[in-house]
Amino acid sequence: MEVICKHYTPLDIASQAIRTCWQSFEYSDDGGCKDKELIHRVGNIFRHSSTLEHLYYNFEIKGLSRGALQELSRHRIASLSVKSSRYTLRELKEVESFLPLNETNLERAKEFLVFVDNEKVNAMSVLALENLRILLSEHNIKNDLAKYAMPESYKTHLAYSINARSLQNFLTLRSSNKALKEMQDLAKALFDALPGEHQYLFEDCLKH
């Protein structure tokens, strides 16, 4: 999985929004320590979390499984633009068979699938991938029908935009060891991709 933060709102946008409430602009230090502390105090300590919604982050996420994508979509206050299987399944048409299930073919399958810590599950995922390949390349089934045979482990690619308040909620829930392992990995990757000067707002959300 690869996560890149493509764009983000500067912190001073949030501090200026907060200062609008009290008309305390004269106390600003132009995005310095005072303003950063203000955002944390008002947004995190005093729980006026709506002030954090002024901060927005735009991520590119590569290599997330379709199964994990379903869980990501449950965090509704966010925007997702996802690689279309209807238009991109042609990537499998010219690929050679993934059988037999040997080390070489399993490694080839990793280009398309997220593997887990269970060899039997991974083997069944590769068989599902092979069935999908056969539908596309040998039976010439259209993408919009063949997509129903896609394994949950199939990798996707998306643009993901979320505000700081919603991201805090996501990190709190998905960094827990009760979350799906792939979602735990995503939570860590999103945090790590944040600009360093923003991470202090989210540190208390991480469960491990």
Swiss-Prot record:
> Partners and quaternary state?
Homotetramer.
Start and end of every ThyX domain?
1-208
Quickly give the catalysed reaction: dUMP + (6R)-5,10-methylene-5,6,7,8-tetrahydrofolate + NADPH + H(+) = dTMP + (6S)-5,6,7,8-tetrahydrofolate + NADP(+)
UniProt keyword annotations, A-Z: FAD, Flavoprotein, Methyltransferase, NADP, Nucleotide biosynthesis, Transferase
Miscellaneous comment: ThyX activity is mechanistically distinct from ThyA activity.
Instruction: Write out the residue ranges of the motif ThyX motif.
Output: 74-84
Cofactor binding note: Binds 4 FAD per tetramer. Each FAD binding site is formed by three monomers.
Which Gene3D superfamilies does the record associate with it? Answer: 3.30.1360.170
**What residues bind FAD, as annotated?**
50, 74-76, 163-165, 169
Q: What is the lineage of its organism?
A: Bacteria, Pseudomonadati, Campylobacterota, Epsilonproteobacteria, Campylobacterales
Positions that bind dUMP: 71-74, 84-86, 147, 174
Name the top EC class.
transferase
EC number(s) from the headed UniProt entry: 2.1.1.148
Active-site residues, Swiss-Prot/TrEMBL: 174
Q: Which cofactor does it need?
A: FAD
Q: Name one GO molecular function term.
A: thymidylate synthase activity
Q: Which family does it belong to?
A: Belongs to the thymidylate synthase ThyX family.
- Protein species of origin: Helicobacter pylori (strain ATCC 700392 / 26695) (Campylobacter pylori)
Q: Name one GO biological process term.
A: dTMP biosynthetic process
Q: What is this protein called?
A: Flavin-dependent thymidylate synthase
Disulfide bond residue pairs: none
